[in-house]
Amino acid sequence: MSYRKLGRTSSQRKALLRDLTTDLIVNGRITTTEARAKEVRKTADKMITLAKHGDLASRRKAAAFVRNVVADVKEDGDDIRVQSALQNLFEELAPKYADRNGGYTRILKTMPRRGDGAPMVILELVD
């Protein structure tokens, strides 16, 4: 199994992929370098596939990878409902992609980064 090292140690690389995958789940799109986006695409597809399974084991595997961050806050009068990234993954993204077999993300190339000329892309979830 091949992967990109991204110029980091294994723990730093895993933390980077966890952060970027969580940001993609929460926001729906992220701007990053092309190499990072290609790696995040793999992990994001795996997380959405786990969410589509929907069982307890899949939820625990996804919870071990996705960061525990607030995805959305909704107010209904006196009630405040806080939705985490994991809830967003299982309650919104899994039903959205129920009929799709993979390919949940899209990479759009943008201008190179000013400063070092790194190829930048927008990684977004397909509608």
UniProtKB/Swiss-Prot annotation:
InterPro entries (alphabetical): Ribosomal_bL17 (IPR000456), Ribosomal_bL17_CS (IPR047859), Ribosomal_bL17_sf (IPR036373)
Keyword set, alphabetical order: Ribonucleoprotein, Ribosomal protein
Pfam families registered for this protein in UniProt: Ribosomal_L17 (PF01196)
Classification via Gene3D superfamilies: Ribosomal protein L17
GO biological process per UniProt: translation
SUPFAM superfamilies cross-referenced by the UniProt entry: Prokaryotic ribosomal protein L17
Family that this chain belongs to: Belongs to the bacterial ribosomal protein bL17 family.
Entry protein name: Large ribosomal subunit protein bL17
Organism field: Limosilactobacillus reuteri (strain DSM 20016) (Lactobacillus reuteri)
Gene: rplQ
